[in-house]
Amino acid sequence: MTQTTAQRPVRTRIAPSPTGFPHVGTAYIALFNLAFAKAHGGEFILRIEDTDQSRSTEQSEQMILDALRWVGLDWAEGPDNGGPHAPYRQSERSEIYKQYAQELLDKGHAFRCFCTPEELDAMRAEQIARGENPHYDGRYANLPREESDKMAAEGKPFVIRMKVPTEGVCKVQDMLRGEVEIPWEQVDMQVLLKTDGLPTYHLANVVDDHLMEITHVIRGEEWLNSAPKHQLLYDYFGWEMPVLCHMPLLRNPDKSKLSKRKNPTSITYYRDAGVLPEALLNYLGRMGYSMPDDKEIFTLDEMIESFDITRVSLGGPIFDLEKLHWLNGEWLRALTPEQLKNKILDWANDSDKLTAIAAAIQPRIHLLSDAVNWGGFYFQNLPSITAESFEHKTLTPEQIMEILQIATWKLEALPEWSEDNIFKTLKGLSAALDIKLRDMMAPFFIAIAGSTSSTPVMNSMYVIGADMTLTRLRHAVEVLGGIGKKKLKKLEKTAADMPDFLAAE
């Protein structure tokens, strides 16, 4: 047990950003935070890091809460159940962050930077031209306080940046790696408070962890290079720093970072596909971790009972769908027929979804048994399709892949998943590509329903939901052969240059 845990009750946290679908990586890190806290008789809390107001949505926040609870993870304190350290949304704590940013300014540990975006762009361009890594050059770091106050009083926009040493190394202690040395010259003078008065992750993270009495920060290894900034902020404030533990990142089978292009990454996708929450949690618990007896199938309680964070391996754990499906099958076969029946009914019994499916198939059926043929694809994981399924009178396979890929990006960016927004997006895409909507839609029927003889596809996309729709579209692109990196980059630019289809109406 560390010195910190000997002095204070263990408290861990997960702090997701509500900017998209709930990621399996969030559940993975949440699981290890909860297991560590419970194993030490402590508490696990959840807070929402929604300082990026342009991307954060209430819908995404609710999806995160629902997904984590579905998978079997719960928290002692959070935005929905409150607690002694409320509020638990960063957007509701902006005055707190301003107070601490001002404290750093007054102590001389931070400074106002009045650079315009154009100045920063020019600075980076010059550095790149000289073969340097782009970084803030500290041009306002030593501006006299009186002059800084005067410029601020005159209304000149500014951000607050932290001061960082330019020489030597920062020594960071990590539970899995021991001492890690990072040269200060690699650490940027981080923006702490933006021009709109909202904090960046780095200030909010440190302030919240201190005020919420977090003793151990267990997070992904992508944050290891930010640890010097956080350690420096704790020093500046004179606070005790939590113990750090940087977990290995989940990987695709090719060892690249887990990405939705190669694997479905949303918790809700696995829920809708029919993975048991116990099985998904079990699988995530095996990611880079082994039980003392090398047991493969175990419950959350069993994991907590014998939990030892030092058993985490630093090799990037591979998130393999085939292994997840095998493990889920083991959990399913361990059920009694009665239990399995109830699991199936629970999985399929979404009243709103069933009503929407009934409305879609009603004009097409003559017998109740016809519902199986017309409605089966709504419940499938992925439709059974081949490249030949997409044969088209006028569109080539390359064109179809490009259409489906751009549609995926555009649909993924929708602020709200509605049939109207789906229609506007696909109608706008057909106009932008100068393809008749009727001709363009045939590949969508195949990708979503596995057949052109189906219920209206835009309605189907709405009913099966964003997660499943996007997964099926990505799957269709891969079935057609996939798009190379160079072509994909070019296609991204094409998509970015297209107008906002929702605003074009």
From Swiss-Prot:
This protein's encoding gene: gltX
Motif ('KMSKS' region): 257-261
The entry's keywords: Aminoacyl-tRNA synthetase, ATP-binding, Cytoplasm, Ligase, Nucleotide-binding, Protein biosynthesis
GO CC field: cytosol
Enzyme Commission code(s) on record: 6.1.1.17
Keyword Ribosomal protein: no
Organism for this UniProt entry: Psychrobacter sp. (strain PRwf-1)
S-S bridge residues: none
Domain of life: Bacteria
Subunit structure: Monomer.
Protein name per its UniProtKB record: Glutamate--tRNA ligase
Chain positions of motif 'HIGH' region: 16-26
Binding site for ATP: K260
Catalytic reaction(s) noted: tRNA(Glu) + L-glutamate + ATP = L-glutamyl-tRNA(Glu) + AMP + diphosphate
Example GO biological process: glutamyl-tRNA aminoacylation
Family stated for the protein in its record: Belongs to the class-I aminoacyl-tRNA synthetase family. Glutamate--tRNA ligase type 1 subfamily.
HAMAP family in UniProt: Glu_tRNA_synth_type1
Protein localization: Cytoplasm
CDD domains: GluRS_core
Role summary: Catalyzes the attachment of glutamate to tRNA(Glu) in a two-step reaction: glutamate is first activated by ATP to form Glu-AMP and then transferred to the acceptor end of tRNA(Glu).
GO molecular function: ATP binding; glutamate-tRNA ligase activity; tRNA binding; zinc ion binding
